[in-house]
Amino acid sequence: MARIAGVDLPRGKRVDIALTYIYGVGRATALEILDTTGVDWTRNIDDLSADEVNEIRKEIEQNHKVEGDLRREISSNIKRLMDIGCHRGLRHRRGLPARGQRTKTNARTRKGPRRGVAGKRK
């Protein structure tokens, strides 16, 4: 089992699919990495030699921000927005959508489950 960027890549999967298990690597980035390293994307992870795995590992470490570094950068960007008090930062602070979506209805993913209002007493 190949281990790249602290992630165990699944056995028996194609290389381009297996690379997407790394946080920050999608299909397009995976194909770009494989194109740069010269590894055929149709091969299985099990079929790669140690040299090819090291080549992929080196490419990811040098030219791509993945896993912990990427998570840290994203959270620091959000924290910066909240600290400067801009509109997007305020929306993050309040747990509301930050990109202009409506909130009268919908937005339940961001707002969480409904909080019911007590009905009128008789």
From Swiss-Prot:
Signal peptide: none
Any single Gene Ontology cellular-component annotation: small ribosomal subunit
Alphabetical list of InterPro entries matching this protein: Rbsml_uS13_C, Ribosomal_uS13, Ribosomal_uS13-like_H2TH, Ribosomal_uS13_bac-type
Biological-process GO terms, alphabetical: translation
GO molecular function: rRNA binding; structural constituent of ribosome; tRNA binding
Domain of life the protein comes from: Bacteria
This protein's UniProt keywords: Ribonucleoprotein, Ribosomal protein, RNA-binding, rRNA-binding, tRNA-binding
Gene3D superfamilies linked: 1.10.8.50, 30s ribosomal protein s13, domain 2
Entries under PROSITE patterns matching the protein: RIBOSOMAL_S13_2
Span list, region Disordered: 89-122
Coiled coil: none
HAMAP family: Ribosomal_uS13
Subunit structure: Part of the 30S ribosomal subunit. Forms a loose heterodimer with protein S19. Forms two bridges to the 50S subunit in the 70S ribosome.
Function statement: Located at the top of the head of the 30S subunit, it contacts several helices of the 16S rRNA. In the 70S ribosome it contacts the 23S rRNA (bridge B1a) and protein L5 of the 50S subunit (bridge B1b), connecting the 2 subunits; these bridges are implicated in subunit movement. Contacts the tRNAs in the A and P-sites.
Entry's family note: Belongs to the universal ribosomal protein uS13 family.
Protein name per its UniProtKB record: Small ribosomal subunit protein uS13
